[in-house]
Design a protein with these regions (language model features):
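Intrinsically disordered, low-complexity proline-rich regions
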Residues: 8, 24-26
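Cationic, low-complexity basic patches in intrinsically disordered or flexible, solvent-exposed regions
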Residues: 31
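Active-site helical microenvironments for divalent-metal-assisted chemistry
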Residues: 46-272
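Short, positively charged and aromatic/hydrophobic N-terminal segments
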Residues: 19, 24, 35-37, 41-49
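Short, positively charged low-complexity motifs
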Residues: 5-8, 19, 52
């Protein structure tokens, strides 16, 4: 009887663990069939506790993989340079990629759950525009990722880049519609990387460097509530989180810019 009771308890615990994995990884069934041949890996995922890292732990992994991260960075810079893509007032597009990854460096510990996800997170940041802007296909990105990462890591990294690729559309709204945002919400780390992308764009546009970015600043301001709502899956899984610290950094950029405009007398309420 004792053995039977223990078996029931263990079975119930395993069932609860399986349930937590479905919450942890919404497309777990697809993932299961993709990696069904690697039973040991599946067991490790099921039994692995979901947690985020301390900042020092994340920083130690950044230092450990610094050479690989730099190689990924250089390859992404060269890719966008090869299609003559620039950013803002004729800056190299790598300037933007570095800003996006700075957000990952600053806040990645708030979403990253294991060492094996560190490199895919950085790859996703550096290659997030590779399909949309640099003429790569999904399979092209996967091939590049396999040159730096394991098969499992390459899949995760490529999924992030794919999720952040705009849809076909005539307008900005069509290119970033519900299908696009749903893809972000369903992909591990994609909401966070997209938030870092928006933080980078807003930080630059609020610097007042050129007329186009001044225009985009107003677009980003108007989009902000809708944007945050659309990329937030409201998940308990840390990999899908929008860290409050990152959102606050973004808000600080807009507040600082508003205060600057007020000092310069450029806000609409001056004179009333």
């Amino acid at each position: 009887m004792l053995f039977s009771l223990m078996s029931n308890v263990i079975s119930m615990a395993f069932i609860l663990q399986i349930y937590s994995v479905f919450c942890y990884f919404p497309n777990f069934l697809e993932f299961f069939f993709c990696y069904a041949h690697d039973f040991s890996y599946l067991c490790r995922i099921i039994c692995e506790a979901v947690r985020t890292m301390e900042r020092k732990e994340f920083e130690s992994y950044m230092q450990k993989y610094a050479d690989q991260i730099e190689e990924i960075r250089q390859s992404a810079h060269k890719l966008h340079q090869s299609v003559n893509q620039t950013y803002g007032d004729q800056l190299p597009y790598g300037f933007h990629l570095d800003m996006v990854v700075q957000g990952i460096r600053d806040f990645g510990h708030l979403v990253c759950v294991r060492e094996a996800d560190v490199l895919p997170l950085f790859f996703g940041g550096y290659y997030h525009d590779s399909i949309e802007d640099a003429r790569l296909t999904y399979n092209d990105v996967m091939k590049v990722a396999r040159g730096y990462l394991t098969e499992e890591q390459a899949f995760l990294a490529t999924e992030i880049a794919y999720a952040l690729t705009n849809d076909k559309g005539r307008t900005r709204a069509e290119r970033a519609g519900e299908k696009y945002y749903k893809g972000i919400r369903l992909t591990p780390y994609a909401p966070f990387v997209k938030l870092c992308d928006r933080l980078a764009n807003i930080s630059y546009s609020c610097s007042g460097v050129d007329s186009n970015n001044l225009r985009m600043k107003e677009v980003y301001k108007a989009e902000m509530p809708h944007f945050l709502q659309c990329i937030n899956p409201h998940s308990e899984d840390p990999r899908f989180l929008l860290p409050q610290e990152t959102v606050l950094r973004l808000a600080e950029c807009l507040i600082d810019d508003l205060e600057r405009e007020e000092r310069e007398g450029k806000v609409w309420w001056v004179g009333y």
